[in-house]
């Protein structure tokens, strides 16, 4: 790297040291909402001792609390903000009743999606109440694609095991019978009676039923949600609630984009659970980014929900999550910094990617401010990134690179975020970034470990390639003279466990195993981290035929899928079976 650094290469906006605004929200406002569409969703924690009415009183006229729950120490919840209110929070800070908050916004799909988005009624009638589960165990699946008419989902009385199906996308695919669940006020759902009515209208033909509904997620054979259900279901008479997460959030599986929708889905399921029952949630998704600790807002909200379910509803609540498949993907890196000794991190940004890319750096509070220089591919000069500021390069009108570097200390330590624009230009997004190796050089006055992680870039639903995942390489893995990447056989990377996983009560982590020499061993791709996976299941039946065979979208169809997302439903089946072992 060239040792010459421009003094003021980046246009910066200073932050206050005690700034409590989510850096992702500051970035969204600074970019004029270029990456996002729709309202701003958020997860919040109130100051201890305050009730949710204190937040309601502070919100704008068109802002709304979606749901909330009382934890052992404080109230947590989700809410919608208008863009005007979000911008005001950036300028003035959040209301005094807010202890902390994180935003989760809809990702803008710049590509023309005509023909793939179902037609939505102008107004979806509200559903204010519905039949609750009477089963001892309620299973909850948060995924994409629910084959409610599958023959193997039928109960002895002929009805489907799906108690309720909630499509959280406003452009829902559930047909005219669907209702908008309250108090959440978005998406649409169907109960068991309505699902069976739709199937009866189609002459008990699954394919015809899904086609008439416009349920596009099930109009192909390989559907992730269907495979998960097939691995999870057992002969026991459990009710199932299926929460279909918004398509826009699945386009880019960043941790922040998922949080509010997953928590809304959990409270939706809790409202249907019978007192004294147990609820087991199958979350087969993963995220790469996040602080990966038990002190984050996400972890605290999960813990509070488990406590609330037990105290207010007499419900035993268990989350089952995937360890993730990122151990070999080079999306995590760890650097040990010595005082005044620079370290290098190379971020390889792939070409022809239609999604923005995000990098997060996390380090302990005691290390203080880090000095960061950034160098674009092909440039001979690096730029110093100012601390305590939001910086845009090369200009606010052409934001190829954005760095959010607050001085504020969070419960998880210090952090900064780097956003790079898409590298594809064949559509209407106005700004693209240079593909290649973006080099970051870090130094500081303290000693400690800096963890780097990329946000997940999803290739695209329905087989439509849209995004490509970048890679991270530390200085030990890079020849600085030629930037040739070395590829040592060092095995899986540490800190690669899913960013949704946290070491708290009520969370079980499932990892993927494979058969080798007659024994089960952990797969190389299964995520590793400080949170230990306590449930291990076979996700590779053969060295030649990868994955586990399971349900397709229709009865009689089978597909193979692998990964820790396949281990999660097997872990759920083990938890809910009488003997504690998964039946065949």
Q: Where are these predicted regions, by residue range?
A:
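Active-site-proximal beta-strand/loop segments in catalytic clefts of secreted hydrolases
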Residues: 46-47, 69, 142-145, 243-248, ...
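Subtilisin-like serine protease catalytic core
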Residues: 126-260, 276, 290-294, 367-368, ...
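Extended charged low-complexity segments that act as oligomerization/scaffolding linkers
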Residues: 2-41, 47-53, 59-69, 95-98, ...
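Extracellular S/T/G-rich loop segment that most often corresponds to the catalytic His/Ser-adjacent loop
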Residues: 167-171, 189-201, 330-415, 423-428, ...
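Active-site core segment of subtilase-fold serine proteases
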Residues: 146-226, 385-438, 443-475
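Autoinhibitory propeptides
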Residues: 2-138, 145-161, 436, 495-500, ...
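Substrate-binding/access-modulating region of protease and related hydrolase catalytic domains
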Residues: 249-335, 355-367, 398-502, 554-569
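Conserved, well-structured beta-alpha core segment at the onset of a catalytic domain
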Residues: 72-74, 81-160, 272-279, 288-321, ...
């Amino acid at each position: 790297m060239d040792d010459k650094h421009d003094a003021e290469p980046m246009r910066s906006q200073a932050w206050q040291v005690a700034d409590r605004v989510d850096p992702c929200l500051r970035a969204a406002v600074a970019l004029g909402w270029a990456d996002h569409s729709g309202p701003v969703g958020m997860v919040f924690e109130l100051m201890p001792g305050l009730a949710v009415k204190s937040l309601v009183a502070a919100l704008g006229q068109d802002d709304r609390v979606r749901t909330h729950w009382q934890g052992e120490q404080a109230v947590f919840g989700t809410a919608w903000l208008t863009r005007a209110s979000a911008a005001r929070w950036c300028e003035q800070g959040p209301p005094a009743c807010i202890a902390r908050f994180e935003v989760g916004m809809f990702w803008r799909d710049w590509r023309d999606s005509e023909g793939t988005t179902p037609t939505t009624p102008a107004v979806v009638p509200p559903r204010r109440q519905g039949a609750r589960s009477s089963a001892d165990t309620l299973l909850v699946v948060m995924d994409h694609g629910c084959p409610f008419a599958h023959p193997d989902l039928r109960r002895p009385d002929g009805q489907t095991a799906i108690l309720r199906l909630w499509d959280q996308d406003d452009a829902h695919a559930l047909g005219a019978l669907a209702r908008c669940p309250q108090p959440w006020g978005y998406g649409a759902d169907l109960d068991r009676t309505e699902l069976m009515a739709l199937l009866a209208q189609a002459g008990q033909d699954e394919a015809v039923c899904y086609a008439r509904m416009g349920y596009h997620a099930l109009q192909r054979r390989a559907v992730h949600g269907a495979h998960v259900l097939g691995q999870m279901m057992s002969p026991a008479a459990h009710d199932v609630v299926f929460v279909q997460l918004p398509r826009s959030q699945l386009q880019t599986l960043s941790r922040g984009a998922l949080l509010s929708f997953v928590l809304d889905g959990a409270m939706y399921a809790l409202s249907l659970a019978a007192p004294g029952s147990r609820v087991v949630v199958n979350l087969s998704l993963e995220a790469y980014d996040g602080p990966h600790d038990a002190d984050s807002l996400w972890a605290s909200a999960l813990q509070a929900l488990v406590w609330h379910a037990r105290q207010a509803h007499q419900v035993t609540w268990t989350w089952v999550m995937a360890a993730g498949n990122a151990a070999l993907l080079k999306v995590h890196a760890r650097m040990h910094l010595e005082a005044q000794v620079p370290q290098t991190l190379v971020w390889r940004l792939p070409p022809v990617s239609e999604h923005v890319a995000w990098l997060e750096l996390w380090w302990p509070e005691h290390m203080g401010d880090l000095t960061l220089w950034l160098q674009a591919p092909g440039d001979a000069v690096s730029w110093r990134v100012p601390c305590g500021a939001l910086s845009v390069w090369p200009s606010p009108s052409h934001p190829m690179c954005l760095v959010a570097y607050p001085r504020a200390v969070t419960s998880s330590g210090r952090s900064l975020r780097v956003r790079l624009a898409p590298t594809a230009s064949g559509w209407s997004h106005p700004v693209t970034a240079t593909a290649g190796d973006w080099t970051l050089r870090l130094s500081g006055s303290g000693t400690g470990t800096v963890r780097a992680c990329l946000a997940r870039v999803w290739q695209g639903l329905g087989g439509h390639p849209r995004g490509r995942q970048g890679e991270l390489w530390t200085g030990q893995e890079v020849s600085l003279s030629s930037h040739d990447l070395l590829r040592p056989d060092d095995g899986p990377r540490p800190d690669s466990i899913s960013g949704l996983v946290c070491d708290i009560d009520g969370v079980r982590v499932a990892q993927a195993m494979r058969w080798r020499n007659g024994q089960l061993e952990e797969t190389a791709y299964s995520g590793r981290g400080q949170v230990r996976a306590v449930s291990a299941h076979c996700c590779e039946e053969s060295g030649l035929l990868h994955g586990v065979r399971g349900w397709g979208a229709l009865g009689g169809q089978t597909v193979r899928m692998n990964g820790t997302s396949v281990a999660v439903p097997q872990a759920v089946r083990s938890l809910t079976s009488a003997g504690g072992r998964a039946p065949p």
